[in-house]
Amino acid sequence: MSSRPQNIGIKAIELYFPSQYVDQVELEKFDGVSAGKYTIGLGQTKMSFCDDREDIYSFALTATSKLLKNYNIDPNSIGFLEVGTETLLDKSKSVKSVLMQLFGDNTNIEGVDTINACYGGTNAVFNAINWVESSAWDGRDAIVVAGDIALYAKGNARPTGGAGAVALLIGPNAPIVAEPGLRGTYMQHAYDFYKPDLTSEYPYVDGHYSVNCYSKALDAAYRAYCKREAKQANGTNGVTNGDASTKTGLDRFDYMAFHSPTCKLVQKSYARLLYHDYLANADSPVFAEVAPELRDMDYEKSLTDKVVEKTFMTLTKKRFQERVNPAIQVATNCGNMYCGSVWSGLASLISVVDNKDLEGKRIGLFSYGSGLAASFLSFRINGSVDKISDVLNIPSRLESRRAVPPETYDQMCDLRKQAHLQKDYTPKGDPSTILPGTYYLTKVDDMFKREYAIKE
């Protein structure tokens, strides 16, 4: 019997985001809010968006086709393909089925779509890894596509939008290895963010409650992860940062990526994990300056307590800049990609940090989707990621985008609203703004069938 696959994980990454963005400083002025409300309060710099020329099908087609092309992947070498998204164009037909046109005669590909707010991409990654680990595996690789177009009605939530998609090649002998058995998951019923109105792209959101749900999910998923890790107890849980007097459990992760509704929430969430370390070992010299009453604080109160937040944000400030900030460069410049968010964070990290500083390092990753579903997992860099970094080329691609004024962004939001669920429709957006190699919508016929072209 042949040996089972080893070092299963991510072998290649492609990232797509639209060619245009709105500057959050300009959006603050346009919305008439105080300076810094979006840029400092939310931690957002720019926000990607698209008009009616692009949709989740075009995003997924672009990301997947570029993954195949840029890594010279034979379409016949793919045996599993799954899509995570909450941007629905059809209540029956999957985005995955649309992508099948990229695979020619290779029709033997498992997987469909997986949906739960921003968590679908992570569930698709789990399904892909599980497939490679299973008796169903036929020796081929898997692809996961995670992406969305995040839009909100006018108001406080609109600056937390964004757009983009990530395509991941998953298989054995990967340079970014998913650490076997190390996952912690938390699932609950909650109405924090949901989309019951299928005639609209806009969600119903209880913002403060959703942040509370996110924090609870982070706590529970991290605790579940730590319990799994402790059970393994095989000597692989060593700390790579700090000495005995400065290390904490958080230091076992050299880098971290989070689902990023806003970059400010990511910063608070990283600090929250150190609070867990404090509760587990409050007598450590690391926490000598922490007020002792924080140890016995009621859990519900701790979720919103400003002293807890400020104390641990201060303690993690330097580590955040070194270990987490590289993973939010896409989020602060593109906004929230929903299902693609945490995976664009991983892409950002790989693209921004030098390969020599990544080899052999551990990456913690937290994924959250409202409603709610959340997981904490980890990867280890097992070899060079130079090829992935070169293909992603994120900093220069972000720099080459086109800024549009908030007035234009507002008009394009209205245009998408008018185009939503239309049939016998020709998009009104300007195709000249779309970059070469990008799929875009050309027509929706009277049977709702959608037609696309590739920008030459």
UniProtKB/Swiss-Prot annotation:
Which GO annotations describe the biological process of this protein?
Answer: acetyl-CoA metabolic process; ergosterol biosynthetic process; farnesyl diphosphate biosynthetic process, mevalonate pathway
Question: What is this protein's expression induced by?
Answer: Expression is regulated by the Zn(2)-C6 fungal-type transcription factor FgSR which binds directly to the promoter.
Its annotated pathway reads: Metabolic intermediate biosynthesis; (R)-mevalonate biosynthesis; (R)-mevalonate from acetyl-CoA: step 2/3
List the active-site residues. Answer: 86 (proton donor/acceptor), 118 (acyl-thioester intermediate), 259 (proton donor/acceptor)
Q: Does the keyword Lipid biosynthesis apply?
A: yes
The residues that hold (3S)-3-hydroxy-3-methylglutaryl-CoA are: 35, 118, 156, 160, 210, 259, 268, 336, 370
- One Pfam family recorded for the sequence: HMG_CoA_synt_C
Against InterPro entries, the record matches this protein to: HMG_CoA_synt_AS, HMG_CoA_synt_C_dom, HMG_CoA_synth_N, HMG_CoA_synthase_euk, Thiolase-like
- Please indicate if the UniProt record lists Transcription regulation as a keyword: no
List the keywords (alphabetical). Lipid biosynthesis, Lipid metabolism, Steroid biosynthesis, Steroid metabolism, Sterol biosynthesis, Sterol metabolism, Transferase
Q: What reaction does this catalyse?
A: acetoacetyl-CoA + acetyl-CoA + H2O = (3S)-3-hydroxy-3-methylglutaryl-CoA + CoA + H(+)
Root EC class: transferase
Q: What is its EC number?
A: 2.3.3.10
One GO molecular-function entry: hydroxymethylglutaryl-CoA synthase activity
User: What is this protein's function per UniProt?
Assistant: Hydroxymethylglutaryl-CoA synthase; part of the first module of ergosterol biosynthesis pathway that includes the early steps of the pathway, conserved across all eukaryotes, and which results in the formation of mevalonate from acetyl-coenzyme A (acetyl-CoA). ERG13 condenses acetyl-CoA with acetoacetyl-CoA to form hydroxymethylglutaryl-CoA (HMG-CoA). The first module starts with the action of the cytosolic acetyl-CoA acetyltransferase ERG10B that catalyzes the formation of acetoacetyl-CoA.
Q: Which family does it belong to?
A: Belongs to the thiolase-like superfamily. HMG-CoA synthase family.
Which NCBIfam families does the entry mention?
HMG-CoA-S_euk
Could you tell me what this protein is called? Hydroxymethylglutaryl-CoA synthase ERG13
- Organism, by scientific name, is Gibberella zeae (strain ATCC MYA-4620 / CBS 123657 / FGSC 9075 / NRRL 31084 / PH-1)
